[in-house]
């Protein structure tokens, strides 16, 4: 029995159940992934005990010589990985990373061009319910109704009309390559700063499978989980002339002490991302996404923009009797985890939606490849064709569990 099982069996049991869910269910949420045992070990280390306000060599606490080393490792590895001038690894999340950039560049009321959440953007890109939409004048851009890809001509028109101080680029539900160079050209016409939020595609960028935003943006933010396969957290890269301003807007601007155990886990993840095996893994994520997209398309499902270039796809259910909410719940009962998601120009509420978002990073971490993606497409079709038939959903769940048992990841933690 572990120390936790002895002292707090209730929490230990929840962890056991969640480990079992991650091990035997099929995780297809595009923003989720499974970290390596090395990352888990670093995050669960005694570094969680150490306060370290400030930056390496300039702390407000004593006894920081060890955590200084680990933070510098994370910074140096991130610089090598992405070719950035300056890196701050202290943000607790992607949202806080974005907030720090807003506060570095803008004053309340300044105009920002950001991707419409309903078209695939993110809450922090200007949603009215988020700090970004409450503090700044947001002008949303989006996708073309015909192609369902970013409308660069319309974005340029909006920029010329509204003269934003900053243009926010990036998405949380966009399956195509983003043209960062085009956004740079637009920004230069109006003297705007470019901030790219590459949270979803950071792993693909690191592996050279998506163009890098670093040459085109003053700031690049990302989470360190998702495709990057590190711990849950954030990171910011910027040009050297913004470094001092950025650092002061993280600490003491919006955060106090950094989470040193998480920064250690980030350092480990960045080392993993510098390996040839990581590049192969990212390539498999994209191959799996394309295989799954093809499998769904040939079974009659409509995908926004017609497919995918990256790790995710949006299944458009608007021409069916299903809603995203019903589809998500039915798939969950069959052991397949996705999330309901709005599609461009959706007429349903965000709590109901006309689509589901599907991604392949977590399944690829388990070891699934194209042949398994064909099976997965069949599972999804079977479930969505029988959302009210509990016997059929149970049968699919049995097949899902059998499939996942062939690709163990954390099974040793269930012993």
From Swiss-Prot:
Subcellular location: Cytoplasm
Associated pathway: One-carbon metabolism; tetrahydrofolate interconversion; Amino-acid biosynthesis; glycine biosynthesis; glycine from L-serine: step 1/1
Keyword field: Amino-acid biosynthesis, Cytoplasm, One-carbon metabolism, Pyridoxal phosphate, Transferase
GO BP annotations, alphabetical order: glycine biosynthetic process from serine; tetrahydrofolate interconversion
Main location: cytoplasm
Site, Plays an important role in substrate specificity: residue positions: 225
Modified residues annotated as N6-(pyridoxal phosphate)lysine in this record: 226
Function noted in UniProt: Catalyzes the reversible interconversion of serine and glycine with tetrahydrofolate (THF) serving as the one-carbon carrier. This reaction serves as the major source of one-carbon groups required for the biosynthesis of purines, thymidylate, methionine, and other important biomolecules. Also exhibits THF-independent aldolase activity toward beta-hydroxyamino acids, producing glycine and aldehydes, via a retro-aldol mechanism.
Protein name: Serine hydroxymethyltransferase
């Amino acid at each position: 029995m572990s120390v936790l099982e002895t002292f707090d069996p209730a929490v230990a049991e929840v962890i056991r159940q969640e480990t079992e869910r991650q091990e035997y269910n099929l995780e297809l949420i595009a923003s989720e992934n499974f970290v390596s045992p090395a990352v888990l070990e670093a995050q669960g280390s005694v570094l969680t005990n150490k306060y370290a306000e400030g930056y390496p060599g300039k702390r407000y606490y004593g006894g920081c010589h060890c955590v200084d080393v680990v933070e510098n490792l994370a910074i140096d590895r991130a610089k090598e990985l992405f070719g950035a001038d300056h890196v701050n690894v202290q943000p607790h999340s992607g949202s806080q990373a974005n907030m720090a950039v807003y506060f570095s560049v803008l004053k309340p009321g300044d105009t920002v061009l950001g991707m419409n959440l309903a078209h695939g953007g993110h809450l922090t890109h200007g949603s009215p319910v988020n700090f970004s939409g409450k503090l700044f004048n947001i002008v949303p851009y989006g996708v073309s109704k015909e192609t369902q890809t970013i409308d660069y001509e319309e974005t340029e028109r909006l920029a010329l009309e509204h003269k934003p101080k900053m243009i926010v680029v990036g998405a949380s539900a966009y399956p195509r390559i983003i043209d960062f160079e085009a956004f740079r050209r637009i920004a230069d016409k109006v003297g705007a700063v470019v901030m790219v939020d590459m949270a979803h595609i950071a792993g693909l960028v690191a592996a050279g499978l998506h163009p890098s935003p670093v040459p085109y943006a003053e700031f690049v933010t990302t989470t360190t989980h998702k495709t990057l396969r590190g711990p849950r957290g954030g990171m910011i890269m910027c040009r050297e002339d913004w470094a001092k301003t950025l650092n002061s807007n993280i600490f003491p601007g919006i955060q106090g002490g950094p989470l040193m155990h998480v920064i250690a886990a980030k350092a480990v993840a960045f080392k993993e991302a510098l390996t040839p095996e990581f590049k192969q893994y990212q390539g498999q994520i994209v191959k799996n996404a394309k295989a799954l997209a093809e499998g769904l398309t040939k079974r009659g499902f409509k995908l926004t923009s017609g497919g995918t270039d990256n790790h995710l796809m949006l299944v458009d259910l608007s021409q069916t009797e299903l809603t995203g909410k019903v589809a998500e719940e039915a798939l969950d009962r069959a052991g397949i985890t996705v999330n309901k998601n709005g599609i461009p120009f959706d007429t349903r509420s965000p709590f109901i939606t006309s689509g589901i978002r599907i991604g392949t990073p977590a399944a690829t971490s388990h070891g699934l490849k194209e042949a398994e993606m064909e099976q997965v497409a069949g599972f999804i079709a079977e479930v969505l064709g029988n959302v009210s038939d509990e016997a059929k959903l149970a049968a699919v769940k049995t097949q899902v569990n059998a499939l996942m048992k062939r690709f163990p990841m954390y099974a040793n933690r269930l012993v």
